[in-house]
Amino acid sequence: GRRNYDDQRKLGTVGKGLRIEGIKIRIVSKYKKHYIGIDVSHWQGDINYEKLVASQKIDFMITKVGWYSENNKRFIVDSKFEKNYKLAKQNKIPLGIYLYSYAKNVEDAKLEANELIKYLKSSGNSSFELPIFYDIEEDSQISYGKKAITDITIAFCETMKNAGYEVGVYSYSYWLNNYMEILRLPADYSLWGADYGTNNNGQIPSDLDKYSKTYDIWQFTDKAQIDG
């Protein structure tokens, strides 16, 4: 069956006022109903993993791996990815990654996937407990239309799946509901949607099951703070 996750973006690093993008995850209710995690990239700077682990508030992490640059004709690795990957592994934090998409068409999406696959294989940073997510939310992509955006998304994900990776799709809920044909996405894709609602105060909401039937991950805030 589908694994369910939720996400609370941008949890702050202690002493720096930076924001880590964080997550709540629900995998197997038999063991634990809700799992909290963080979503991080270069925007959060250097994370204090010792404090992060000691806080006992984080069950997993999803980190930005990078993006394909059309101008540079190469895959650009997020400047903090390799450090975050290494320290997540050292601290036994279950890990997933996401690629930010700038694809204009199916061919671009396949190129993004193949360049990511090449990087993962060449770097050896390719062991993940959680899916590889396709982050599709660029304003310039909206004009392509629902079908094209969905075709782009599926092209990336199927290329990654064929290389042996679990996959998922990330965007904000309005995008997923209005700019994509999400019912076309295969059932084995994890779906991660951001919706901060009207009470975006950084606290874990009481209605954590709000999107349990819609998304596998619900990203519910960009205001939360944790040690690390």
Role assignments for model-derived ranges:
Residues 33-157, 161-163:
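Substrate-binding cleft of extracellular glycoside hydrolase catalytic domains
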Residues 32-44, 55, 185-228:
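Functionally critical loop-and-helix segments that line ligand-binding/catalytic clefts
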